Amino acid sequence: DTLVGFFGINQKPTSSKDPYALRRSALGIIRLLIENNKEFKIKDLITYAISLHRNQGFELSNESLQEELIDFLLDRLKYYMKEKEIRIDIAEASINSFGVDHINKIYKKALTLNNLINKQVGKDIFSSYKRAANILDSELKDKQLELSNTTDPGIFKNEFEKNLLKKINELRKYFTNINRDENYIQSLTNLANAKKVIFEFFDNVKVNDEDKNIKKNRLELLQMLCKTFDNYINFSNIEIN
């Protein structure tokens, strides 16, 4: 309510001033949700607070109120994660994967990856992802090639293509079925365990096939793989040493 009121009349914190302690108020909301393991529909709450102010006759002149307040809360979430020594690129990647209504999920996902990124699980995830992403980026760069994120199993030439598609579908099914009680370590472990199938594909399949249809189909497969990883957390934004 306080945040909506001040943002509504454009009394937002600046880089040097925060006379109404709005940063502290926003950080309090973040801490309340995370430390009590709660999710809340922040967008609905902002909309409700706006309607309360207007019903009481307050003039809210800021037309970008909701968007600016959401950005402000996510910035405070980033600050909170920095306090917890979560890498900034991991924090941003997690934020980019979800909206403000999933603050607790954003934090837990980032925290878990931050703890595992330099361990074998993290190394396996990124070696698999980068190998696929690098080939995909190289083939799509400055070329007239449009992919549809679907692949045609009918023109697969070997078992390695079939196995990769099967693994992608297994991962997608897992992520579709997880709920708010997600085991974040298990989720990352599942991604890491895909390395064997992914590397077998690259070791035995020539993506840049002479047949353009087969080549495109294999690139579609790689795009599906990368999007499956990115739908969990935006791995493309994370730096690897």
What are these regions (language model features)?
Residues D1-N241:
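Amphipathic alpha-helical "coupling" segments that flank catalytic cores
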